[in-house]
Amino acid sequence: FSPSTTRLESRVRELEDMLDLERDARVRAERHAADMSFQVDALSERLDEAGGNSSQTHELLKRREMEIGKLRKDLENANASLEMAETSMRRRHQTALNELAAEVENLQKQKGKAEKDKNSLIMEVGNVLGQLDGALKAKQSAESKLEGLDAQLNRLKGLTDDLQRQLNDLNAAKARLTSENFELLHANQEYEAQVLNLSKSRSSLESAVDDLKRSLDDEAKSRFNLQAQLTSLQMDYDNLQAKYEEESEEASNLRNQVSKFNADLAAMKSKFERELMSKTEEYEELKRKLTLRITELEDTAERERARASNLEKIKAKLTIEIKDLQNEVDSLSAENAELARRAKAAENLANDLQRRVDELTIEINNLHSQNSQLEAENMRLKSQVNDLVDKNAALDRENRQLSDQVKDLKSTLRDANRRLTDLEALRSQLEAERDNLASALHDAEEALREVDQKYQNAQAALNHLKSEMEQRLREKDEELETLRKSTTRTIEELTVTITEMEVKYKSELSRLKKRYESNIAELELQLDTANKANANLMKENKTLAQRVKDLEAFLEEERRLREAAESNLQASERKRIQLSSEVEELRGALEAADRARKHAENEMNEAQTRVSELTMQVNTLTNDKRRLEGDISVMQAD
């Protein structure tokens, strides 16, 4: 069970105890009313006995007519004044009875209205209890969400550490790639110089081969001419015997030149083959080194790609978690707004209760002043009653009639007391409902403080992960503000309705009390026992004053709690502003990290581009080598 539920149960038990005390007080009041009725009956019997004694007094008066002759005139005057007083008293009693009947009807109507208001208040209390249960459930869900957020915060801290380590590794790889890039550029320059040298040697070899081809063509042509000449010489051998020796010498010279040229060609060919073999070996060694280097670079690039894909996956996971946390923050914001709305409603209720206490205090002061006036009037009437005791004998019949009227008025008074007791019970019920609302306000404020604390913790965790939360929070704040305004208007309308009902109840109760006190003042002319009712009224006033003091103490406590809640809200606002500044700083840090990551990705792409360019250059060199090998094989075949 939560602390709020325990406090609510204890409050319910206290209210049940108070209800039992009120029932006991009501039983005692009914017993007191029964005792009063018994005393009134006893007084009526005494009045009847006094009537019998008055007849004896009349007989004595007949015997002493001479002695009381002077008093007869006074008695007639007194009878006339008493008859006039009796008429006025009857008129007043009749008017009071009519007013009491009208008041009874009004009280019945007000009772019906009070029942309706009571039912509506009971429904509102049920709604408040339901909202309290919802707040408790929201509190439990917020606690579970807070635990989940703590776990996610720890996991995200681990992921942040991993990302930091990976960023350090990327920076180290970037530095290593930069140095390797410089080395590759230097090697590339050397390779370009070697390629230029090879191109120059190739061009020289090609020119030499062209010269050799031209010389071979010339030699082939000359050989063909020589063969034709030899054929013509063989055909003309017989005719040119004289010239045979010269031609033989020329042929031997030509053979010597051809053999010498063949020897020079073989030497040049062997020399070129040796140079080509050495260059080919150097090229193969360079190709092998470049292949190893390209393999290493490809492995490094593959590792970087895998790392980049892992980073993308981690980024996607973090994005999903940030969205989940955003949804949880939205729900916590809604719960916070709901609790703030309840705190506002409770504050309005406390203000209404304060106004009610002030009005009750004013009414109590008015009742005290009226009570003092009634006591003075009571003393004056008592003196007049003492003056008229001697003339009571002539009013026996009127006393009997007045006794009957007193009985009727007593029954009416008992009905009025019963209705007044019902109204007092209704007022105690309203006070109990007010206490329940006050306890609900206290619980709501405690839940608000707990949810505010959890909301601050969750906000601190979320501010390390997402920078776009401020816009959404502002939108949610606007929606919550509109919801708070509409709810506040509804609560104000309800408060106005309750206030009007209380004002009507107070006005009717005050009017009933005034009329009741006027009836008691009129009945005190005939019955001294009405002073006890006045004493009871004083006791009720004291009890009401004590209740007012209790209400003032309770309202003072409520005001102190409200001020504490306002200070807590101000502290929460300051923390929210501080967290907003931290969010801006974290946003700048995250943007700097994104820029560094993009820069590293650009450098990695540039390195991959350079590796691909080097691969293309190696392929070009390989193709050139193959072409040279083909040319050399063609030359060797020639």
UniProtKB/Swiss-Prot annotation:
Coiled-coil intervals: 1-638
Gene Ontology cellular component list: bicellular tight junction; myofibril; myosin complex; myosin filament
Single GO term (MF): microtubule binding
Record's subcellular location: Cytoplasm, Myofibril
Domain of life according to the entry: Eukaryota
GO aspect biological process, one term: microtubule cytoskeleton organization
Keywords annotated in UniProt: Coiled coil, Cytoplasm, Motor protein, Muscle protein, Myosin, Thick filament
Quaternary structure and partners: Homodimer.
Family as reported in the entry's similarity comment: Belongs to the paramyosin family.
Functional summary from the UniProt entry: Paramyosin is a major structural component of many thick filaments isolated from invertebrate muscles.
Name recorded for this polypeptide: Paramyosin
UniProt source species: Opisthorchis felineus
